[in-house]
Regions:
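Active-site-adjacent structural segments surrounding the nucleophilic cysteine of cysteine proteases
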Residues: 1-91, 158, 197-199
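Conserved active-site-adjacent core of cysteine acyl-enzyme catalytic domains
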Residues: 15, 26, 77-199
């Protein structure tokens, strides 16, 4: 019944998968560094924010891009405030998300990041292999969408493809989204960090 409610848009419970729900067959897995850390969640920022999953998603992307050190709660709060100041309350379409993201990354000390639209599992896998988190706009009904952050993936021999996500409601990246599954993927935007210049 919960699954049916989710598909009809009567709840915010998206039918994401847990690790023990995934196929048991051998697979190829990619995982960004630092995915075991605590991420920002919408529940951390109730006032004055509403429908702020896009800002939380962007804050979590910035956390991933700062893999060289531990990100404490104060830093998570600061990154969220930056993202929220530029993105505001949702719902946000992909174009609006991308427009605010460049400025937020620059202000967070991550200049030179590039946004790359991804339209296939292969493109997403390639970006994740390079260490780029991917902002994913998903929907379960025409009026019920949500931003999540892909921080890894699994690809099986039968071609099934799962994204490891920070869903914005749980502090750990322990949910999975199946490509072509019941939760529809509307867009994927990889956030590619500027490469350090090679020393001569």
């Amino acid at each position: 019944m919960d699954y049916l409610k989710a598909l009809l848009g009567m709840t915010n419970e998206y039918p994401f998968f847990r690790k023990n729900d995934l196929p048991a067959e051998p697979c190829r897995e990619i995982r960004l560094a630092g995915t075991g850390r605590r991420f920002a969640v919408t529940g951390d920022y109730q006032e004055p924010a509403r429908n702020h999953c896009a800002a939380v998603c962007l804050a979590n992307a910035m956390i991933c891009l700062k893999t060289d050190r531990t990100v404490k709660q104060e830093e998570r709060d600061r990154l969220f405030r930056r993202a929220y100041a530029l993105l505001g309350n949702g719902p946000l379409f992909t174009r609006e998300f991308r427009k605010g993201t460049g400025n937020a990354l620059f202000e967070a000390g991550l200049p030179g990041c590039r946004l790359r639209p991804c339209g296939s599992p292969g493109e997403v896998r390639s970006c994740l292999e390079k260490g780029s988190p991917c902002a994913v706009l998903v929907m379960i009904s025409s009026l019920n969408w949500h931003w999540v952050l892909a921080v890894g993936c699994r690809e099986y021999e039968d071609g099934s493809f799962y994204l490891r996500i920070c869903d914005g409601w749980n502090a750990r990246a322990d949910r999975w989204l199946r490509w072509g599954g019941p939760v529809r993927i509307r867009s994927v935007t990889a956030i590619e960090k500027k490469k350090a210049a090679a020393s001569l």
